[in-house]
Amino acid sequence: MGFGKKKVSYFYDEDVGNYHYGPQHPMKPHRVRMVHNLVVNYNLYEKLNVITPVRATRNDMTRCHTDEYIEFLWRVTPDTMEKFQPHQLKFNVGDDCPVFDGLYEFCSISAGGSIGAAQELNSGNAEIAINWAGGLHHAKKREASGFCYVNDIALAALELLKYHQRVLYIDIDVHHGDGVEEFFYTTDRVMTCSFHKFGEYFPGTGHIKDTGIGTGKNYAVNVPLRDGIDDESYESVFKPVISHIMQWFRPEAVILQCGTDSLAGDRLGCFNLSMKGHSMCVDFVKSFNLPMICVGGGGYTVRNVARVWTYETGLLAGEELDENLPYNDYLQYYGPDYKLNVLSNNMENHNTRQYLDSITSEIIENLRNLSFAPSVQMHKTPGDFTFENAEKQNIAKEEIMDERV
């Protein structure tokens, strides 16, 4: 692993763990608080520029979403749900994407962190920016989907396009990054690359032949994988695909969605990656030395989510962490071993060498059809995209110390 030192900004809002999708719902925003508690108790915060994100406004969110949809998210509450019943159907808000107390505020924290991360890169304040509360890749222009309401990733990509000619989006969540792909399916300014389970599995999209349309033809890359993929198999596809994208697309900035539902033993996942295999992806993307945003995403076995995102925070900051977890507020979650590790299991790998070689070859052949490093003069850069009252707030070291045990 490459533990080289870089300037890293880390976004965290202490309120993020207060939001609840519901007692039986697998999405637990509390996991981001667990990560932060480990970051603090490993003393990692000393190596990071810790920033409380400026919360995204409705105007910020409507850069990607319709006014009507964002207005609905702003207005709907558990107490007013019945009045908004027709809107809930229209905007796909219900079971998977429930109405809960503070829904709009949760979205504004998630989106604000990712937009702020892009602004840190644009300003040169950071080489890497982290927002584990982001990564909500299923959200669409006018509807919620797959536990996601506002597409913070698309908002961050738009912000990056102000200063970077080409942006690469990489997704290692077990689910296809359909929402982000849809936003940029017709442009050559953003390339999307998703590694995901394909077949009878949510959201059911991401076929290898789905490569974009019009100007965006060949700028969407889909890597459809089968159940049980392990570290070695994943690496054998990930590294050549990303290397060829870097060579042919030549991105100037990259967003990496680090969904942890691709880990072994995830409550909703079907892959068999260890912490080592998952973090290999982070390390490999980091090695290209591009301005880089890392966001969260899926991950439903929360003790493993916290372990891996903490380890990857250390990796991004150039700090190797002790395998023995420090004492922290959530120590009981990590028994019986109390280690900073997630191991693969004995799950069968349905990805044969022949299958992996065939999809890798097809993807690389598609990339060869790209005109080398697209000319940006042909396509207008989006207008200025700034926060209202966009003053970032650095957390004082004393405040962080309050979280230490």
Swiss-Prot record:
Recorded catalytic activity of this chain's protein: N(6)-acetyl-L-lysyl-[histone] + H2O = L-lysyl-[histone] + acetate
Keywords: Chromatin regulator, Hydrolase, Nucleus, Repressor, Transcription, Transcription regulation
List of catalytic residues: H138
MF term (GO), any: histone deacetylase activity
Gene3D superfamilies assigned: Histone deacetylase domain
Superkingdom to which the source organism belongs: Eukaryota
Localisation per UniProt entry: Nucleus
Start and end residues of each stretch annotated as Histone deacetylase: 6-318
Example GO BP: transcription initiation-coupled chromatin remodeling
This protein's GO CC annotations: chromatin; cytosol; nucleus; Rpd3L complex; Rpd3L-Expanded complex; Rpd3S complex
Assigned EC number: 3.5.1.98
Record InterPro entries: HDAC_PDAC (IPR050284), His_deacetylse (IPR000286), His_deacetylse_1 (IPR003084), His_deacetylse_dom (IPR023801), His_deacetylse_dom_sf (IPR037138), Ureohydrolase_dom_sf (IPR023696)
Function: Responsible for the deacetylation of lysine residues on the N-terminal part of the core histones (H2A, H2B, H3 and H4). Histone deacetylation gives a tag for epigenetic repression and plays an important role in transcriptional regulation, cell cycle progression and developmental events. Histone deacetylases act via the formation of large multiprotein complexes. Has a role in chromatin assembly and chromosome segregation.
Quaternary structure (record): Heterotetramer of alp13, clr6, prw1 and pst2.
Record family assignment: Belongs to the histone deacetylase family. HD type 1 subfamily.
Protein name (Swiss-Prot/TrEMBL): Histone deacetylase clr6
Species assigned in the record: Schizosaccharomyces pombe (strain 972 / ATCC 24843)
GN (gene name): clr6
